[in-house]
């Protein structure tokens, strides 16, 4: 079995593949203060509840945007599983040309998503990933990563509103009953929710106009399912896109 690990700023998503089949997945909070041993205990407990042993895992691949945790998880792999993991970054073969001023600047998660999306659809794509930051990535019809845009995530936007406006409460991110809201909580939700739908559709529309490839628009990330129903541009939500991309990259690098 293959263990894939996607380390984001807010969450770590783990998945276990048996060949091409995702058999289990978990989402846990990112904690930069945890040691390799503490993450080892966490993984052990998740595995135990799923009836999986460390010895069942034959390889590991990691995508991380948190450098301090990359090292911790590499150490976890060596100590608890007995081998060095694959880490998405320099030296990993993606099979995708990266048209970026400095390809090393592109977040690992963005490349993983692009690889998975093109492998699945074989057409031009815009991939919207709703994470701590929301990223918009453009892949052309030739399968080349062309770049994209980065915007503050929904949680960051809501937290900034709470912290900077002293009379406004912290509220749940949710679709409000109406855009013309009748109370403060719903008013904040309306501004954040519909403002974000407008942000997504606005950026996607501009990218479509600039790219001229008639791309398919895919959303992923924890809050994709909340925004997609009101979006005029998102065509598909794929919650496992990043995990699938890690599996594909593992296959490409194992075979070389």
Curated annotation (Swiss-Prot):
UniProt xrefs under Pfam families: Pan_kinase
EC number: 2.7.1.33
Organism name: Geotalea uraniireducens (strain Rf4) (Geobacter uraniireducens)
Keyword field: ATP-binding, Coenzyme A biosynthesis, Cytoplasm, Kinase, Metal-binding, Nucleotide-binding, Potassium, Transferase
Metabolic or biological pathway, per its Swiss-Prot or TrEMBL entry: Cofactor biosynthesis; coenzyme A biosynthesis; CoA from (R)-pantothenate: step 1/5
Gene that encodes the chain: coaX
Any single Gene Ontology cellular-component annotation: cytoplasm
GO BP terms, alphabetized: coenzyme A biosynthetic process
Binding-site list for substrate: 100, 107-110, 184
Catalytic center residues: 109 (proton acceptor)
Primary role: Catalyzes the phosphorylation of pantothenate (Pan), the first step in CoA biosynthesis.
Localization per Swiss-Prot or TrEMBL: Cytoplasm
Similarity section: Belongs to the type III pantothenate kinase family.
Identification of the protein by name: Type III pantothenate kinase
Predominant place of localization: cytoplasm
Residue sites binding ATP per the record: 6-13, 132
Catalysed reactions, as listed in the record: (R)-pantothenate + ATP = (R)-4'-phosphopantothenate + ADP + H(+)
Known partners and oligomeric status: Homodimer.
